[in-house]
Amino acid sequence: MNLSQEDWVAQLGADENAVILDVRTEDEFNDGYIENAVNIDINKGQAFIYEIEELDKNKNYYVYCRSGARSAKACQIMNELGFENAYNLLGGILDWEGETVNP
């Protein structure tokens, strides 16, 4: 499900069962990420699928990438794998107005 930044942040803030998932490359992730995000690179192909399948399907996943395209695809893949609650951040981190962690 696609959510605007406002809705994504509001829903995430009220969700005690939330996981933030960053599907960008490791290099992109290391340039800055949303606090508490877990990085699983969607460009890894089958390895991405394997890592996603290890996640708890009972959690709610708030997914983002650079602009929203890869995270939309990740949410679609997650839905196909049986994850019922995967929320795509429209506009990605490019449009993110919140704070980021810069390692």
Please give the residue ranges for each predicted region.
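Rhodanese-like catalytic fold shared by cysteine-dependent sulfurtransferases
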Residues: 1-19, 26-60, 66-103
